[in-house]
């Protein structure tokens, strides 16, 4: 057997190339076997695309990335049209190969030291009042990228003193305590880390991740910052049952997580994990009611809900679905 080619820095691997060496092989889906999208998942495009074009131009001008584009989010048009975007720092190449995600895999470049200042200025120019910052996984960095998060938060607040900042962080595998020490110097207004799915599906959906580590990350942050809301998100449609999701919600509450997002998984390409079922809106409503009954202060549950979808409204406690 020939040895796999060494990854070249900055080269993006997608689709079949991305998932070629994960533990549970993904069999490409044939179009005729893929489930047909139900009517409740039809996305309405805005009448005008000017605002969308303006945000894309601002991102390109400042060499910034949005997870909206890199992960092919179905809500991109709606969010960009409302003047909101989720910034993705530390480049657009992830060191993981999660087969549900459309972000490219590969060997990332060195972090851009100017990114925090460029992001702060862009946010000021866009007159944003609430911003979500996320990142690719950077297992190649000693701190997993924690210092870059802290630098971004600091620079954003210097130019935008009244802004609210939510961070959606990776799992900082093997360096949770060190990462939290760094983030304690510039804590966010909301701390978010997604569990993504039930633990029995981690091997196929989140290779390289660990369910308990993710729970521990959320709990340890909350222990350090009891006044800062913690948040997590899950996808449905990967083969889990509603009872399994309910158990995850109980685990999240046992680890002091207060905010929840729950949405429908959509298959980015035939090379990604297939959608096992489309969950009806009524079932999302039932899970939202269950989440609220066990103590979540806010639960955004619906087919099109994503972690940062109307995150500003989520933080205000308003209904999002």
UniProtKB/Swiss-Prot annotation:
Keyword Secreted among record annotations: no
Cofactor: how bound: Binds 2 [4Fe-4S] clusters per subunit. One cluster is coordinated with 3 cysteines and an exchangeable S-adenosyl-L-methionine.
Catalytic activity: [[Fe-S] cluster scaffold protein carrying a second [4Fe-4S](2+) cluster] + N(6)-octanoyl-L-lysyl-[protein] + 2 oxidized [2Fe-2S]-[ferredoxin] + 2 S-adenosyl-L-methionine + 4 H(+) = [[Fe-S] cluster scaffold protein] + N(6)-[(R)-dihydrolipoyl]-L-lysyl-[protein] + 4 Fe(3+) + 2 hydrogen sulfide + 2 5'-deoxyadenosine + 2 L-methionine + 2 reduced [2Fe-2S]-[ferredoxin]
Cofactor(s), by name: [4Fe-4S] cluster
Compartments where found: Cytoplasm
PROSITE patterns for the chain: RADICAL_SAM (PS51918)
Enzyme Commission code(s) on record: 2.8.1.8
Sites where the protein binds [4Fe-4S] cluster 1: 68, 73, 79, 308
InterPro entries given in the database record: Aldolase_TIM, Elp3/MiaA/NifB-like_rSAM, LIAS_N, Lipoyl_synth, rSAM
A Pfam family reported for this protein in Swiss-Prot or TrEMBL: LIAS_N
Keywords in alphabetical order: 4Fe-4S, Cytoplasm, Iron, Iron-sulfur, Metal-binding, S-adenosyl-L-methionine, Transferase
Sites where the protein binds [4Fe-4S] cluster 2: 94, 98, 101
GO CC terms: cytoplasm
Gene3D superfamilies: Aldolase class I (3.20.20.70)
Pathway: Protein modification; protein lipoylation via endogenous pathway; protein N(6)-(lipoyl)lysine from octanoyl-[acyl-carrier-protein]: step 2/2
Recorded superkingdom: Bacteria
Broad EC category: transferase
GO MF terms held by the record: 4 iron, 4 sulfur cluster binding; lipoate synthase activity; metal ion binding
Ranges where the Radical SAM core domain occurs: 80-297
Family as reported in the entry's similarity comment: Belongs to the radical SAM superfamily. Lipoyl synthase family.
The protein's name in its UniProt record: Lipoyl synthase
Organism the protein comes from: Shewanella sediminis (strain HAW-EB3)
Gene that produces this protein: lipA
């Amino acid at each position: 057997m020939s040895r796999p080619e060494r990854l070249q820095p900055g080269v993006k691997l997608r689709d079949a190339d991305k998932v070629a060496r994960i533990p549970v092989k993904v069999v490409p889906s044939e179009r005729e076997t893929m489930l047909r999208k139900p009517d409740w998942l039809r996305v309405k495009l805005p009448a005008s695309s000017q605002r969308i074009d303006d945000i894309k131009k601002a991102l390109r001008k400042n060499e910034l990335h949005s997870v909206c584009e890199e992960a092919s989010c179905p809500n991109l048009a709606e969010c960009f049209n409302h003047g909101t975007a989720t910034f993705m720092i530390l480049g657009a190449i992830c060191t993981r190969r999660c087969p549900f995600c459309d972000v490219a895999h590969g060997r990332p470049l060195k972090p851009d030291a100017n990114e925090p200042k460029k992001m702060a200025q862009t946010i000021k120019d866009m007159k944003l009042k609430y911003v979500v910052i996320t990142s690719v996984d950077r297992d190649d960095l000693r701190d997993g990228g924690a210092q870059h998060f802290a630098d971004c938060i600091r620079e954003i607040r210097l130019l935008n003193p009244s802004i609210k900042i939510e961070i959606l962080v990776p799992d900082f595998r093997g360096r949770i305590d060190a990462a939290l020490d760094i983030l304690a110097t510039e804590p966010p207004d909301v701390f978010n880390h997604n569990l993504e799915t039930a633990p029995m599906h981690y091997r196929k959906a989140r290779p390289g991740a660990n369910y308990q580590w993710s729970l521990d990350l959320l709990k340890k942050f909350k222990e350090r910052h009891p006044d800062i809301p913690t948040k997590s998100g899950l996808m449905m449609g990967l083969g889990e049952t509603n009872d399994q999701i309910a158990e995850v919600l109980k685990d999240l509450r046992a680890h002091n997580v207060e905010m929840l997002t729950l949405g429908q998984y959509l298959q980015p390409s035939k090379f990604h994990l297939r959608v096992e079922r489309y969950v009806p809106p009524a079932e999302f409503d039932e899970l939202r009611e269950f989440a609220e009954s066990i103590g979540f202060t806010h639960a955004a549950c619906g087919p099109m809900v994503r972690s940062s979808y109307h995150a500003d409204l989520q933080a205000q406690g308003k209904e999002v679905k």
